[in-house]
């Protein structure tokens, strides 16, 4: 699969490279926050880009490469990230409510304090991820690979974990006792 380069992408008539440069300056107090709401970033090479705090609501990132990207506090509400490569990204406090992450490669991702309400992680690769203190109500993890995932301090009672092997997952305190007593 061939990925699209940043310089070839546009959103609302602006080159993506210009939007990202302004976003970098935003953190220094002189630019503007990247608003990529509804952007078509499918199959894009976004590896190692800084999208911390960016707005990507309902954006299409299917099949994109986001490996090593900086994504803390980004808003991916309703975004399509199916088959995206998110390995080793920091998504601390990002919002992925209602996002589609089916079959995403997300090993090593930091989902600390993320809003994952109603996110779809079906058949995603989620090895060595940190879901600590994340909100996962209504999230679907059916068939996901969650080996060595951290779910401590996370209320998983309203998440769908059907078909997930949790034998190596660090679970919330008392999870096994609650499950056995149910």
Regions found by a protein language model. Give the residues of each.
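Tandem repeat scaffolds
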Residues: 5-182
């Amino acid at each position: 699969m061939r990925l699209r380069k940043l310089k070839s992408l546009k959103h609302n008539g602006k080159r993506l490279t210009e939007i990202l440069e302004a976003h970098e300056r935003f953190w220094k107090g002189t630019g503007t926050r990247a608003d990529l709401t509804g952007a078509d970033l499918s199959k894009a090479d976004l590896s190692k880009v800084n999208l911390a705090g960016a707005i990507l609501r309902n954006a299409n990132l299917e099949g994109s490469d986001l490996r090593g990207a900086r994504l803390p506090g980004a808003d991916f509400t309703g975004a399509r990230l199916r088959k995206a490569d998110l390995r080793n990204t920091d998504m601390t406090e990002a919002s992925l409510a209602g996002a589609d992450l089916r079959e995403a490669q997300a090993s090593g991702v930091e989902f600390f304090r993320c809003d994952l309400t109603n996110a779809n992680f079906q058949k995603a690769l989620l090895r060595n991820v940190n879901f600590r203190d994340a909100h996962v109500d209504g999230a679907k993890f059916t068939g996901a690979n969650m080996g060595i995932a951290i779910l401590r301090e996370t209320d998983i009672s309203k998440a769908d974990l059907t078909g997930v092997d949790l034998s190596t997952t660090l679970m919330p305190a008392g999870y096994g006792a609650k499950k056995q007593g149910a």
